[in-house]
Amino acid sequence: MQRLLLYVHFNKFNFISGHVLYQLEKIRPLYSRVVFISNSQLSEDVKDNLSSQNLVDDILERQNIGFDFAAWRDGMKAVGFDQLANFDSVTLMNDTCFGPLWDLKLIYQQFENDGEVDFWGMTNYRKDKDFNEHIQSYYLSFKKQVLTSSTFHEFWQGVQDFTNVQDVIDNYETKVTTNFLDAGFRYKTVFDTIHEDTTGMLYPDFSYYNPTAILNHKIPFIKVKTIANNEGIMPYIFDELERVSNYPLDLILNHMSMIDRPDYPYLLSRKYLKNQELAGEFGKKVAVHLHVFYVDLLEEFLDAFKAFHFVYDLWITTDVEEKKQDIEKILSNRAQDATVVMTGNIGRDVLPMLLLKEQLSEYDYVGHFHTKKSKEADFWAGESWRKELIEMLVNPADQILANMEANPKVGITIADIPTFFRYNRIVVAWNEALISPEMNKLWERMGATKSIDFKNLNTFVMSYGTFVWFKYDALKSLFDLNLTAADIPAEPLPQNSILHAIERLLIYIAWDQKYDFRISQNPHVLTPFIDNKQLNNREDLQPHTFVDFNQIGGIKGALKYIVIGPARAVKYIFKRLLIRK
């Protein structure tokens, strides 16, 4: 069979997702010619890869004018309307779906052998007060008898470049089916939804509102928008997909994390590291940066580093000459190679790492750690925190690098939440809101390309204590800020500082650089009832009033508030009591 595929691609960030490449690879054998029509700009490397891998035969780049229908029209023009009759079928498809979840070959054979079918698709939409019955346009296939008809040519040559997507829906998507039905042609779909039960659905759009039905009827494609629209059940859909299909779920996770925020709950459920081992000799360049403020903890880390089964360079920073000498003595006694750099007592562990920009930029992977203690809280805060971070990010370093190497889209690995922050109610939305302005400032300073207002987020997925593994490119924009001691408050460090902002920004910086993240699971398993008890408090249902004394008088304003606030409260109480009398 001579089949033509006209495949439309669009990505608002002007890159091509892995799920598109996978899709083309899997469906390519079905078609004798594939025309790839991109409504967004492609790099030369991407175009070369598409051609060299024989994923497509032709590449057509165009402005995103007229959306998919105008793109398909232009694809037909590129092939030649008079040449379409040389094909047994023409299939129209776009990249708005993940798949194929199952092999398409049997579906093609079924419809090609069905004499009662002139054109077909995956799913349809029943007639309602707004639209006529129609095949949903993410997948349409026309047989030769339709291709050679005047109806086909008149419809597609008449497609206009609408700038409003609703005009495209009203004039083309919902009418392409009725146009051919009125001409006497017949259609079928893989999943005929016309008489299906729609209980609980906002609209009878099964491709969007009912992913369970899509899987049950073995539709080989699931729409991207369906994933985001059904967050509450998506973890179960993912489980079912793993059970019934061989489709790589990482393709869904990576794409959804790139086109929207990477920290939605349904995505977090799938971001734990996989059980993966380093294969053979690991050839990438690895740097380990350890900031040593407490020299008495150095050997604890050196012992932990013995778990590494890869070659690495150790960079140690500290604040004063005396400590530098003590560190070098310990290293000498242990015959441990390392470069020790004195960076001063500003910026805690973060600025010392950033000051090594020139050195660390030469490495593929960087692990960042520090001798964590907590002077502001109980001994066990810092003690438990440090030990658990070592268990999550130092001990399993082989597994971490194996995961990051296996998935090129993963650029950073953080630790799971340390138990101290589950037993103790510290990181809560009202406190986090106070840090978001500083995060927004840094985001703007870095020239981030993705739009996000951190004030709109309740909490953040962060690397507690800034322990982290990363690909240098993932955090390059942070290093390129070239922060200095002048940017960092002096000790004692105030709350909501630039360092607290950086701690919370790391995975989002990587996201802006088109990298996803993974989480190393805490081996200390706690019942989620602890979180339920700590976080679900009735007081949180009441509005909170915050007073920022930095904006209303500083210390004098705070003292005035102590006097005036209670006085006004007492006055209010007396007034209410008098009214009751």
Regions flagged by a language model, labelled:
Residues 1-581:
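ER/Golgi luminal nucleotide-sugar-dependent glycosyltransferases, focusing on the catalytic module
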